[in-house]
Amino acid sequence: MTDKTSLSYKDAGVDIDAGNALVDRIKGVVKKTRRPEVMGGLGGFGALCALPQKYREPVLVSGTDGVGTKLRLAMDLKRHDAIGIDLVAMCVNDLVVQGAEPLFFLDYYATGKLDVDTAASVINGIAEGCLQSGCALVGGETAEMPGMYHGEDYDVAGFCVGVVEKSEIIDGSRVAEGDVLIALGSSGPHSNGYSLVRKIIDVSGCDPQTTLLEGKPLADHLLEPTRIYVKSVLELIENVDVHAIAHLTGGGFWENIPRVLPENTQAVINESSWQWPAIFTWLQTAGNVSRHEMYRTFNCGVGMVIALSAPEADKALALLNEKGENAWKIGIIKASDSEQRVVIE
């Protein structure tokens, strides 16, 4: 036994020093996201967070998500700065549609070989997303797993917890015939449909870094971070009686809008109320994608759809546009027993 080489964890492909260096790199940006309810600092076995005292009957709302194969595109193009924003956005946008205020966020970062610069870039993006949504980044897990991922490839997952007053939960149960539907413009494909995006790029033979669309590289359009609607929507909820909110993610219009509709109602979308952003027109043309498939796969320029009573619509539009959103009336709710829950005409 004495003549054998002494092995270390680093020999097995796990660099603890690199992990410690990453923690030192991110401490500053993580601290900026802190909320007054958070107790303790980074590095504990668990993160502690008190409930905000303003809630009389608080209900916790939780969510988890990733960014799908947008991550593959980001890795191929070596652009990691916005992926963290995407990760937070996918989680907090899901929470706020139920009326919840995001409280804290945790991330999971897994890789075959830890590149401190890449990981720090991703986590800086996560911190930025948390700042945009008023959410505290309270911890995470960085897992270096040689043999599980190819080289420095990585994957990320996010976990978020928010809180809503029990009496103010938004669940779509009050959606009624005559309600107006308001759209919030998206920043691009957000974090959905990227397996099809990558297939279209492959089939078309274009280089996303040199192919120009509206004067900038296609890559810029495709890697534009997912818009975070939290602060705008929370202010809307405080001032307007909102009946339902749908976050248009995987499944697009056909699958996400029905998730907030009661039985015997139908969302009628006016397709002429907006123009698809150029990236969606390019994807449809380059991939010869059908209209139905576009609306099933992509948000086509609409990040959220909000249902509220008709008399509240103008007030809601004014507030949302004042907050910097691109908001417009996109449709109405009709009474219907049809199996087709969404009609786009």
UniProtKB/Swiss-Prot annotation:
Q: Which reaction does it catalyse?
A: 2-formamido-N(1)-(5-O-phospho-beta-D-ribosyl)acetamidine + ATP = 5-amino-1-(5-phospho-beta-D-ribosyl)imidazole + ADP + phosphate + H(+)
Task: Output the Gene Ontology terms for molecular function.
Answer: ATP binding; phosphoribosylamine-glycine ligase activity; phosphoribosylformylglycinamidine cyclo-ligase activity
Q: Which cysteines are joined by disulfide bonds?
A: none
Annotated InterPro entries: PurM-like_C_dom (IPR010918), PurM-like_C_sf (IPR036676), PurM-like_N (IPR016188), PurM-like_N_sf (IPR036921), PurM_cligase (IPR004733)
A Gene Ontology biological process in which this protein takes part is: 'de novo' IMP biosynthetic process
Q: Which GO terms describe its cellular component?
A: cytosol
* Localization of this protein: Cytoplasm
Q: What is its EC number?
A: 6.3.3.1
User: Looking at its record, which EC class is this enzyme?
Assistant: ligase
Predominant location category: cytoplasm
Task: Tell me the route in metabolism or biology where this protein functions.
Answer: Purine metabolism; IMP biosynthesis via de novo pathway; 5-amino-1-(5-phospho-D-ribosyl)imidazole from N(2)-formyl-N(1)-(5-phospho-D-ribosyl)glycinamide: step 2/2
> Which UniProt key words apply to this protein?
ATP-binding, Cytoplasm, Ligase, Nucleotide-binding, Purine biosynthesis
Stated family: Belongs to the AIR synthase family.
Q: Which NCBIfam families match?
A: purM (TIGR00878)
How is this protein named in the record? Phosphoribosylformylglycinamidine cyclo-ligase
Name the gene behind this protein: purM
